[in-house]
Structures are given as C-alpha cells and as structure tokens.
C-alpha cells in the first residue's frame, strides 16, 4: 500500500492530468472509513481515502470523485453530490458516482419460492410464515443453510 506521501503525489498527478489544475493540500489514508471510498474536507481542503479501496482497479475513479469535490469547492461552484456542476464535471473526467463495495457479505441462507423458483440469498434467517415471494407472492422455503 502507498504511504500518505505517495498517495498525495498520486492525487497531485491525477489532478494535473484530468483537471489541468494543481492539488495543493494533503491526501491521506483513513482506517475508519468503512463504506465510502473517500472524503473531502472543505474546512482545510484535505482528502481522506479508504485503504480498502487501494487494491481495487477503480481506485483512480474514487480519487477523481474526491478531486471533483475539491476543485469545484475551490472555484466556488456547486461541489455537493446533488449539484449539476458536480454531476457534469464528474462525468467529464470519468470519475465514479458511487464507491465500489468493499464489504464482503456473508450469505448464510438461501430461500426460494415454491411457485416461481426465485432465489433469495440472505444474511439472516427470515420468518417464512410472515414473508412471501416478491415476484409471485408464493411461499418461501429454506433451500440451504451456510452454517
């Protein structure tokens, strides 16, 4: 994994390549990030990144996403996810709109519908008397348990 200095250098390089503007602040790893790819801090303009994202091939897209926040904020334009400026610039540079999932879900139970055969992978057990198939309203049965 890259050090914080190497990460900052990579972010600066990507900023010049895609935005033709310099990144003049710090980029660092944040171990506490679980589901997000990164965070932009308007208060001091630094970027935090999830270290689990570093191994993904889409990591450059996560960096582009955070740099989009950074450059729009510095140019006093809409830098939030809902703003048209953000959506437009993000699509122009090819950044990711959403962070890829790094959480590996442990599927323990597989339910299937008796009527249509629709399969429902689940992490937790469900009450088959209470829940039905969302497709045809058929009865659900437990196929296999991963225990």
UniProtKB/Swiss-Prot annotation:
Q: Give the GO terms filed under biological process for this record.
A: response to stress
Cofactor-binding details, from the entry: Binds 1 zinc ion.
Give the highest taxon in the source lineage: Bacteria
Q: Where in the cell is it found?
A: Cytoplasm
Residue ranges annotated for the SprT-like domain, each copy included? 9-142
- One Gene Ontology term of the molecular function aspect: zinc ion binding
What SMART domains does the database record attribute to this sequence? SprT (SM00731)
Q: Which cofactor does it need?
A: Zn(2+)
State where it is primarily located.
Answer: cytoplasm
Name the active site residues: 66
Task: Look up the coiled coil feature and give its residue ranges.
Answer: none
Q: Where does Zn(2+) bind?
A: 65, 69
Q: Which Gene Ontology cellular component terms are annotated?
A: cytoplasm
Q: Does the keyword Isomerase apply?
A: no
User: Any idea which UniProt keywords this protein has?
Assistant: Cytoplasm, Metal-binding, Zinc
The text of the family note is: Belongs to the SprT family.
Which NCBIfam families does the annotation name?
PRK04351.1
Full protein name: Protein SprT-like
- Which species? Lactococcus lactis subsp. lactis (strain IL1403)
Organism placement in taxonomy: Bacteria, Bacillati, Bacillota, Bacilli, Lactobacillales
């Amino acid at each position: 994994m890259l050090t914080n200095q190497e990460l900052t250098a990579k972010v600066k390089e990507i900023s010049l390549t895609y935005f033709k503007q310099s990144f003049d602040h710090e980029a660092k790893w944040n171990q506490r990030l679980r589901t997000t790819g990164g965070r932009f801090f308007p208060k001091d303009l630094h970027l935090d990144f999830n270290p689990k994202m570093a191994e993904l091939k889409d990591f450059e897209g996560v960096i582009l996403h955070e740099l989009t926040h950074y450059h729009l904020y510095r140019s006093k334009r809409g830098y939030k996810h809902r703003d048209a400026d953000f959506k437009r610039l993000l699509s122009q540079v090819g950044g990711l709109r959403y962070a890829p999932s790094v959480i590996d879900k442990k599927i323990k139970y597989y339910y299937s519908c008796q009527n249509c055969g629709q399969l429902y992978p689940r992490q937790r057990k469900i009450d088959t008397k209470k829940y039905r198939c969302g497709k045809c309203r058929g009865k659900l049965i437990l196929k296999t348990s991963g225990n």
